[in-house]
Amino acid sequence: MESEPKPFTQISQGKNKHTKIEEKPIKTNMNEEIKSTINKVKQSRNISLEQLKLLLEINDDEGVRFIREEAVKVCQKTYGNRVLIRGLIEFTNFCKNDCYYCGIRRSNSQADRYRLTKEQMLDCCASGYELGFRTFVLQGGEDGYFTDDKICDLVSAIKEKYPDCAVTLSIGEKSKESYKRYFDAGADRYLLRHETADEAHYKKLHPEEMSLAHRKQCLWDLKEIGYQVGCGFMVGSPGQTVETLYEDLQLIRELQPHMVGIGPFISQKDTPFADKASGTMEQTLKLLAIIRLIHPHVLLPATTALGTIHPKGRELGILSGANVVMPNLSPVNVREKYKLYDNKICTGNEAAECRYCMENRMKSIGYEVAVSRGDYIE
């Protein structure tokens, strides 16, 4: 687990109920180059490799506070002090892939496999709807049992019952034809983390049968079809460098996704990366802030992984420019089995507990949870 976070700016409610950053003078000992670089990145909505290196090396409290404050200001211009909430349904932990970092990889014989039925998933949606969720995220491994027909039937059923809700799919690499079928059935969004945009790094994380080119093509296919598209990567994955992170940011700039999901790499004991060091909260928060500065309107989650490496991780993510949280709606008896990484939080809480816990956490830092679809705002 991470140590206590570095100090960050306290926030209070302004008269208009939008979160207001308490102004504190920047100490003169903060490197002026850092402040200037942050302002340049914000204004240009782009970053060079040299600028990225400089910002990721910030280690003084004032520099870290400044970049996070600037990211929050940028986020609030579009989204105010509203945190968008999604209900996560992890419906299968079967997967045909063998990614070296993932606890549900094909060759992990220790994984306790499960699949939810359509009825179970609709029950999750029903309880979620009552709790105010208006986006459902259906996430799972690449499981051949769930054919295109089954996915389309499920999406159609959810949209028919809850026409005011968005359905997000996160079920991996498929053909363009499959993606089109899901879209025509009513799916609104699709999350597909690219994990790394660097070819050599991709090969360190995945077996030979998987290809970065194919994953990138999937993202472009999804965008062309008309989805709100999400990509993303782990922070601190084995083999990651400042140079590979720069490639990630360039891919994001090229793709212009509606969502970017990043969180710290956390090892899982039954994978080839069991003994690898986890990514840090500090670097994750800095990267959240950088992504917000260069993509002001992007939907940016404060992930469960961030909450796993620090008890206040999700709050700190919001205070670094994130604006989405995804409490778990999955049945409690399967949550522990969806073990992408170890020590995952909130596996024993009922959906209502997760919902109100999240609301209270956000209130504690001056934010409100929005009961809406939470679409991307241009």
Label each region the model flagged:
Residues 7-11, 17-60, 129, 253-378:
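Auxiliary Fe-S-binding modules of radical SAM enzymes
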Residues 44, 71, 99, 138, ...:
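Conserved, mostly hydrophobic/aromatic
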Residues 46-83:
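An N-cap/entry alpha-helix motif that binds or orients negatively charged groups
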Residues 79-120:
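Canonical Radical SAM [4Fe-4S] cluster-binding loop centered on the CxxxCxxC motif
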Residues 86-89, 139-148, 200, 266-275:
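Glycine-rich, proline-tolerant flexible connector loops at the mouths of alpha/beta enzymes
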Residues 87, 125, 152-156, 179, ...:
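Generic structural signal for well-ordered alpha-helices
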Residues 106-121, 128-149, 154-219, 228-235, ...:
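Core AdoMet radical
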Residues 175-182, 238-251, 308-319:
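Catalytic cores of alpha/beta
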